């Protein structure tokens, strides 16, 4: 990709994007066993190969696969944090600077059907991920690491709760899920077409999925306010509750050796 951009004459410093390299996800979905050393080598080589793409995030944490398997909000968040922390450890052990390691990681998370719970999940995630990244300071918490501590999230509407019967009802589910993610301030949203559970999405269903986001942006103006949930007693309290439960589960995972 770097060579291609070079041949095309692009300035790689001006390019923004992501590459979803995630060996742990492949193991979860395909059952192929990889050693910790193999995973660490894969992601470290990916980050080093993409060093010219300074605004690219090349390592993915795909907890969306857990969401699509029925994981609840705090559970998905806990495993996503443990997943990300594992990659942070692998990268820093491979000699990648802490802030570069944090900047390389992108979270691909699912959006469940519990409207307020999902808003709280993403808000809690930003807080807890910053706490984890801060633990990698060596020997001081530099400005670069502080800036890199912001959780980058791509959210995808869940497939777990979609029905094949009266599939247009899925539009209601995906619309409220999209609203949850937008209010929570994620960086990117993917709306699953309403017919994706039983057929290859059609041109019509894909167009509707795109328009669902445009409605929230252009007509509801969901892109105009930063953290619109801030100050709401209910959402602030729910965010704290989700954060506490997710952190408890995260620590339990770490006590058992982390994702490996």
Task: Give short role names for the model-derived ranges.
Residues 65, 129, 195:
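Glycine-rich beta-alpha junction loops
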């Amino acid at each position: 990709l770097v060579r291609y951009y070079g041949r095309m004459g692009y300035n790689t410093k001006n390019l923004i994007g992501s590459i979803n390299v995630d060996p742990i996800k492949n193991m979860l979905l395909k059952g192929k066993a990889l050693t910790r050393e193999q995973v660490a080598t894969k992601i470290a080589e990916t980050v080093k190969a993409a060093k010219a793409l300074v605004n690219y995030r090349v390592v993915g944490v795909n907890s969306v696969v857990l969401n699509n398997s029925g994981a609840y909000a705090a559970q998905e968040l806990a495993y996503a944090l443990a997943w990300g922390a594992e990659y942070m450890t692998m990268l820093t052990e491979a000699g990648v600077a802490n802030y570069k390691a944090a900047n390389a990681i992108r979270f691909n998370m699912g959006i469940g059907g519990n409207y307020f719970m999902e808003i709280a999940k993403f808000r809690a995630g930003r807080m807890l991920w910053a706490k984890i990244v801060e633990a990698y300071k060596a020997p001081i918490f530099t400005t670069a690491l502080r800036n890199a501590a912001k959780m980058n999230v791509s959210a995808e509407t869940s497939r777990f709760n979609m029905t094949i019967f009266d599939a247009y009802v899925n539009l209601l589910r995906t619309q409220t899920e999209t609203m949850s993610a937008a209010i929570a301030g994620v960086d990117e949203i993917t709306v699953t077409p309403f017919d994706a559970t039983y057929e290859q999405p059609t041109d019509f269903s894909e167009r509707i999925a795109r328009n669902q986001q445009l409605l929230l942006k252009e007509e509801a103006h969901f892109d105009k306010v930063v953290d619109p949930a801030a100050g709401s007693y209910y959402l602030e309290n729910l965010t704290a509750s989700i954060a506490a439960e997710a952190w408890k589960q995260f620590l339990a995972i770490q006590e058992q050796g982390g994702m490996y």
